[in-house]
Curated annotation (Swiss-Prot):
Disruption phenotype: No visible phenotype, host DNA is methylated on fifth position of 5'-GGTAAG-3' in chromosomal DNA, BREX still confers phage resistance. BREX systems (bacteriophage exclusion) provide immunity against bacteriophage. A probably non-essential part of a type 1 BREX system which protects against dsDNA phage. This system allows phage adsorption but prevents phage DNA replication, without degradation of the phage DNA. Methylation of bacterial DNA by PglX guides self/non-self discrimination. Induction: Transcribed at slowly increasing levels as cells progress from lag to exponential to stationary phase. This is BREX protein BrxA. GO terms for biological process: defense response to virus.
Length: 213
């Protein structure tokens, strides 16, 4: 960490930066795993039960205990931005409901995703562009370093992984057709998704999620 940020004000800035990024490194939407975690959260498990289910029973079908714990921690952090009614939709609703709500959770836990959607994806659509350029994430990061200096503390590989996770999440939520082709697509929120945002006091996100802002 650079000396310029060693003051208490600097530490606050770095802390806020970390909150802006959230756990984007943790993965894209992880729909199947998130459904399983939502089901578990709805049982209000204590820590022992949580560990038994995640590690002992390997309910995420992960390749190792550490991978299971890492995925579970990331998903729980994201789902905790929602309410129990949203968890029920993620656990029992349609795939489209689940993906829209998981994208909302990702945005709430990693506000960098909201900014990328508003400033890059939606701007491209306003310009009637057809594709999300392959370098759009790196250009966005470069444009944000002064405002969010913690970005400079991440390795190139970590920045690239964040970008890959973000593009995969955009594809899962329908904003691009595939992570490889990146053809831009319109997204219309389901009534259930809009209701969750209203309940959470996040109705301002509706216009961003639908590309109107």
């Amino acid at each position: 960490m650079r000396a310029a940020f060693q003051s208490s004000e600097g530490f606050s800035m770095i802390k806020n930066d970390k909150a802006w990024i959230g756990d984007l490194l943790g993965g894209p939407l992880m729909s199947r795993e998130s459904r399983v975690i939502a089901e578990l959260l709805l049982t209000d498990p204590d820590e022992q039960t949580w560990q038994e289910q995640i590690v002992g029973h390997n309910i995420l079908q992960a390749s190792s205990p550490n991978t299971a714990k890492r995925y579970a921690a990331t998903i729980r952090l994201r789902l905790n931005t929602l309410d129990k009614s949203a968890w029920t939709l993620i656990a029992e609703g349609s795939e489209r409901e689940r993906q829209q709500l998981l994208f909302v959770a990702l945005m709430l836990h990693s506000p960098v995703v909201k900014d990328f959607l508003a400033e890059v994806v939606n701007d491209l659509r306003r310009q009637f562009k057809e594709k999300l350029p392959g370098n759009s994430w790196n250009e966005f990061v470069n444009s944000q370093v002064r405002l969010h200096p913690v970005l400079a503390s991440y390795s190139d590989s970590s920045i690239a992984k964040m970008g890959n996770n973000l593009v995969k999440a955009l594809a899962e939520a329908g904003y691009v057709d595939t992570p490889r082709r990146r053809n831009l697509q319109a997204v219309y929120l389901l009534p259930e998704t809009q209701a969750v945002l209203q309940r959470l006091g996040q109705q301002d996100l509706i216009s961003i999620l639908e590309g109107k802002r």
